[in-house]
Amino acid sequence: MNYLSTRGDSTPRKFCDILLEGLAPDGGLYLPEHYPQIDRTTLDHWRHLYAQHGYATLAFEILSLYIDDIPAADLQRICEKTYTPEVFGTLEIVPLKKLGNGFYLEALSNGPTLAFKDMAMQLLGNLFEYELARRGEQLNILGATSGDTGSAAEYAMRGKQGIRVFMLSPHGRMSAFQQAQMFSLQDANIHNIAVEGVFDDCQDIVKAVSNDLAFKRQYKIGTVNSINWARLLAQVVYYFAGYFQATSHAPMLRAGASALPPEGAVPGLGRPGAGRNDEKVDFTVPSGNFGNVCAGHVARQMGL
């Protein structure tokens, strides 16, 4: 699979290159040349894999369609290292909670920082560490946050070899909880920088650095926000997992105790058993910059 810039640069790039680059040299976003098409047989196979082997196996199957420059065995180990009950609190990783007849809540906030962004950031941290070790390189991650992005990124990158994080945040304009999450980290590779101003001032600094290609290349600067295709790709997986659970009609595995349902909800569904792949499911997504919804759009483009 090759990737091209949305601004017209037709130079094909491989996944591991765009993972470390973030933005294309012309300022565009990297997208795959095409979206792999999933037929009914593949959906049936993925449903079975998710039921029998769990979320990490499903993630490997989907990521493999877009990543062909990491050996399959290595990619599978990365997925298995990332999506564990120890990190996300449940066997299902994204357990579904039934709120009413045909109405469910997919729990995406059971990760280390209690934000859905853990789902992709935890994978990014392991992908970065793997690829940087393979190349013998280091990466300086520069980001801007008003809360959950910074926390999720720092908890995913803390202690990772070859990675240093410099996270800008507006001074006095974050929630006390998320500020405590970030500023309490003592890892040597995590650097929090409070900026006098608002979030847009922080973001403007990051954009200015990203647009200075010579500076960016000299100091090996990368990104972890939703402009990085790897983050969006990781989020595609939980749309498939949610679909399989919502359309399951067989007894489920019990959700882990740490994944508490909302008040008034019935017990969790857990991983799916048998089900049908011709049912339609509507996903309603609270969204800020639309990256989360975009991942759902990619899943639908693939045939979900």
Descriptions of predicted regions:
Residues M1-A259, P267, R276-L304:
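PLP-dependent amino-acid enzyme catalytic core
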